[in-house]
Amino acid sequence: MYIGICICVLLAALSASSTGQQTVGSMNEDPGAREIEQQNILQHPRHIRASSSAQLKPFQRIDGTSDQKAVIGAMLAKYLQTRKAGSSTGRYAVLPNRPVIDPTHRINDRDYMGWMDFGRRSAEEYEYSS
C-alpha cells in the first residue's frame, strides 16, 4: 500500500516537472527559432486524416428480423430463469450423476461432494475400528 502511494507521488512529480520544463522552454525561445520552426512545418506538411464522422455510415442489420429477436429474447429469459433456480443451491450445484450421501453418515457436514478431511477421517478409522 505504501509503495503504491510512493509510486503515485513520484509519477505525479515527474509529470509536473516535465510539463513545467516544456512551458518554460517555449517561453525562453527567441523569435528567430520560432520562425525557423514554422518554416520547417510549412516545408514538410503533415498528412491529416479526414474526420471520422464524415466516413461513417449508419449500420443496418440485414438479418435482424423481429422473429429472431423474439426467439433470442425467449432463450435469454429461459436461461436466466434456470440460472436463478440453480443459484439457490449455492456456488457448487450437486450434479445428478453423483451418488447421494446418506444423511445418517458419521461425517455429514461436507461442503461439497469431493470434500475430505484427512484428520477427521483418520480419527474415525481409529475410533470406530474396534
From Swiss-Prot:
Compartment list: Secreted
Residues of the signal peptide: 1-20
Transmembrane segment boundaries: none
GO cellular component terms attached to this protein's record: axon; extracellular space
Single GO biological process annotation from the record: digestion
The record's account of how the chain is modified after translation: The precursor is cleaved by proteases to produce a number of active cholecystokinins.
Domain of life, source organism: Eukaryota
Tissue-by-tissue expression: Expressed in brain, lung, testis and throughout the length of the small intestine. In the brain, expressed predominantly in the optic tectum and brain stem.
GO MF: neuropeptide hormone activity
Modified residues (Sulfotyrosine): Y112, Y126, Y128
Record-given protein name: Cholecystokinin
Gene name in the database record: CCK
